[in-house]
A protein has these predicted regions:
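Glycoside hydrolase catalytic-domain context in secreted enzymes
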Residues: 1-747, 756-763, 767-768, 784, ...
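Short beta-strand elements
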Residues: 769-785
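Surface-exposed, short loops/turns at beta-strand junctions within beta-sandwich domains
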Residues: 752-753
Length: 798
């Protein structure tokens, strides 16, 4: 007879409740554990480690496999072993990183998080996530460790490139779109991370304590998570490593139960960041043993420990059996895990699709190229771009220029795969084996003047083998402009102060009509990288070797274009002075070379906008556009001038900045009404016209400023935006609908409040390039449910 949990016509919740009631303690405990698939290659079978079944499988080892069929084969083998180990045949969830695509080289690659944010295109983000879900589930992967919802205001932090930048509204819009695209049709479950305040770590140091007030934690850092929970029906959340106010999220009831589940209404699955539960004992000394750390985490509401069995161990299981730890804690965790499995359809379809070799379609590649192209930001241009037909000879200089590897950043398949070449990796929660054969053969020589290990000479051949259709920037330029001669010299590396290549590079620059210099560091996961997870920096400028070269190049009086690759924005006085144009390329993925070539040659028009404020110097940090009144670069009192004694308060480039090859004109911002009830919706509109002779895309940005409030409020806040495609001379109408609940803030009693009073609405091409303003009055007060307030204003283009 069919049991209720076997009936697919019932809801996931009903099926999970029925199955839970049939499971014994051993079976239930297996569901909160994770098996690391790499152990299957080390003689540690899943049947031995998890004889009663297992909740999740870490499939990061799939990155080392060359094709989708091999990944699917591994998952099929493990899934069969897991399902055969228990009498209820419960399938496991297989998880992998998906920030820039499914983290295998057989899947489509996309730009890093900052690049995605720079498109300001939630609709495109949803399409990207749907592509990831289709490719991942075809291989048998059902849990995606993305998107990254951390708000980052510190470019010293090596993981900035994973984020959507500094603004909670932009992050909410982009991340919620990602969640919707990924979870559509229940192909995969999204896991948003890192809850909470992770990249507010002191000193820009990975896993360092985050000093954030309870108010800011909720208004800023929790907002993207709340939007995804409310509007995206988010399936899972991963904790932050960073301690907040003396509490570590992995073992904090206040953070996981009271805030996440209580205040924010999250009812999905919580999973630990790698090794975070055992670190409650080993690093933070909050527990007396691994099992005690497991108890703290389970009591706090941590459902599953990743990536392997450590604190959710046999000792903890026996403590539950004896009643020392309440079994009800285990039951509630397992109920959520089973519900997610039923929602994913794993009981009906536990295995990969057959014949997954051709999952990357031409449409997937075209989408990747389009996102890469629209992620790039023209920061500066005095007219040298696009390249004129009169430019016949171009000198191309820099390590990145002829490197396919340079197109990829952290949390990409290639960044993980290059760790097989023997440079110590930096991924948190993963033990690096210094005695491994790869490490023994590693090249440990560093770039002169730095502690960065020289790139293994095998990396670039590996990159070209993994992505045979990818072009370096130089290769793509030669294809895009066949009648232009492109001369190449490396000139300088990506770290240190080496100058031995200067002479050859300066010689080709002398002979050229224009010079393109690639700038920046090496974004990835190991000791040969300059930014990435666990790879933080004191300085935010270019490496000395690049700064000095630009100074020497300046004496030639040649037009110079700088193209910057990195996981944080370019910040250089020298580059600003020497370069006639600067293109921020981030880490654009496999299609990045072609995207850059299209932009430089004018076959495409840049439309990316900064998702972060760019500091002039690390001494300014934190510098961000939505700072509180009378703070940062909007000081109005307490200082004789709005500047440091040795520099300006103002940023190098402002949030939302980005140039185009055409010009856009904005007409008057008009409001339907100038008085709105506190529970009402403000409606407004304006016309935007392409006043140039080239088709382009403008990102129209809406900001608000509370003229007078009971709490200190930001000088301005992004509330919505619209991406407008315009032909030369074309005009379109942008309509805004702004629910007043989006203007709610926490009052003195920590209640969400929409407060009566005057508010200024602004529209502009950036946070500083404001093109129109209008004032309105909020009539009365309202106290909306914080879970159900508006997060991003609706815009329509007519």
């Amino acid at each position: 007879m069919m049991q209720k949990y076997q009936d697919s016509s019932l809801s996931p919740e009903e099926r999970a409740s029925d199955l839970l009631a049939r499971m014994n303690l051993d079976e239930k405990f297996g569901q909160i554990q994770c098996y690391n698939a790499i152990d299957s290659f080390l003689g540690k079978s899943v049947e031995k480690q998890n004889p009663y079944g297992v909740g999740q499988v870490c499939i990061l080892i799939a990155t080392m496999l060359d094709d989708a069929g091999s990944v699917a084969g591994l998952i099929t083998r493990l899934q069969k072993q897991i399902m055969e180990s228990g009498k209820h045949h419960i399938p496991a969830i297989f998880h992998i990183e998906t920030l820039t695509g499914v983290m295998v080289t057989a899947a489509t690659s996309f730009p890093c998080g900052l690049g995605q944010a720079s498109t300001w295109d939630p609709e495109q983000q949803q399409k990207m996530a749907a592509c990831i879900a289709r490719q991942g589930r075809a291989m048998g992967i059902s849990h995606a460790l993305a998107p990254v919802f951390d708000i980052c205001r510190d470019p010293r932090f090596g993981r900035m490139g994973e984020t959507y930048g500094e603004d909670p509204t932009l992050a909410a819009a982009m991340g919620t779109a990602y969640v919707k695209g990924l979870q559509d049709k229940h192909r995969m479950s999204a896991c948003s991370k890192h809850f909470l305040g992770f990249m507010a770590g002191q000193g820009g140091i990975h896993t360092a304590q985050a000093v954030v007030s309870p108010r800011e934690l909720r208004e800023v850092y929790a907002k993207p998570f709340q939007a995804a929970i409310t509007d995206g029906k988010l399936d899972s959340v991963m904790n932050s490593y960073a301690a907040i106010d003396g509490q570590v999220p992995a073992g904090s009831k206040a953070i996981l139960r009271d805030l996440l589940r209580g205040e924010m209404g999250f009812n999905g699955v919580t999973v630990s960041d790698y090794s975070a539960v055992e670190q409650l004992e080993s690093i933070y000394h909050l527990a007396e043993s691994p099992a005690d750390a497991g108890r703290l985490a389970l009591e706090a509401g941590m459902d599953q420990e990743l990536p392997t069995l450590a604190a959710y161990n046999d000792e903890l299981k026996e403590n539950i059996r004896s009643g020392v730890v309440q079994e009800s804690l285990l039951n509630e965790a397992v109920l959520r895990i089973l519900t997610m499995k039923f929602r994913l359809g794993l009981f009906e379809n536990p295995f990969p699709a057959e014949n997954v070799q051709a999952e990357i379609t031409p449409a997937d590649t075209a989408l990747s190229r389009k996102i890469a192209q629209e992620s790039m930001i023209l920061l500066k241009n005095d007219g040298v771009l696009p390249l004129a037909k009169s430019v016949k000879k171009v000198a191309v200089i820099g390590w990145h220029a002829d490197s396919v590897r340079a197109l990829f950043g952290g949390y990409s398949a290639l960044a993980m795969k290059e760790n097989t070449l023997g440079v110590k990796m930096s991924m948190a929660g993963i033990q690096a084996d210094a005695d491994s054969p790869a490490a023994e053969n590693a090249v440990q020589k560093t770039y002169p003047g730095s502690e960065v290990v020289m790139e293994n000479p095998g990396v670039e051949p590996l990159a070209r083998r993994c992505y045979p259709d990818a072009y370096s920037m130089l290769g793509a330029l030669r294809l895009a402009a066949p009648h232009t001669e492109f001369l190449y010299a490396q000139g300088y590396p990506y770290a240190g102060n080496e100058e031995s290549g200067y002479d050859a590079a300066l010689q080709i620059a002398k002979d050229a009509d224009l010079v393109i210099c690639t700038l920046g560091g090496h974004y990835g996961w190991n000791a040969s990288c300059t930014t990435g997870e666990g790879i933080d920096a004191m300085h935010i400028g270019l490496p000395v070797c690049q700064e000095r070269f630009l100074e020497k190049l300046e004496s030639l009086h040649k037009p110079v274009v700088g193209v910057h690759f990195d996981g944080h924005p370019i910040s250089s006085d020298t580059a600003d002075r020497v370069c006639n144009a600067i293109l921020e390329a981030w880490a654009p993925g496999a299609q990045g070379g072609e995207a850059i070539a299209a932009l430089l040659t004018g076959k495409a028009n840049p439309c990316g906008k900064l998702p972060c404020t760019v500091a002039r110097h690390e001494g300014q940090i934190p510098v961000y556009y939505n700072h509180p009144t009378n703070t940062c670069y909007s000081m109005t009192g307490g200082t004789p001038k709005n500047a440091y004694i040795d520099g300006a308060h103002t940023p190098r480039y402002c949030f939302g900045h980005g140039l185009s090859y055409t010009k856009y004109e904005y007409d008057t911002l008009r409001l339907e009404k100038d008085a709105i009830q506190a529970d009402g919706v403000l409606k407004g509109q304006l016309h935007v016209r392409n006043a140039g002779n080239k088709a382009g895309t403008e990102i129209v940005q809406f900001y608000v400023h509370d003229v007078a409030a009971s709490m200190v409020r930001p000088v301005k806040e992004l509330v919505g935006f619209a991406k407008v495609n315009l032909q030369p001379g074309e005009e379109k109408t942008v309509c805004l609908s702004l629910p007043m609940s989006q203007l709610a803030f926490l009052d003195a009693d920590m209640r969400w409040k929409v407060e009566h009073g005057k508010v200024e609405l602004m529209v502009g091409a950036s946070s500083e390039d404001i093109r129109g303003k209008a004032e309105f009055m909020i009539v009365g007060d309202a106290y909306p449910d914080g879970k159900n307030r508006s997060f991003v204003a609706d815009t329509k283009i007519m």
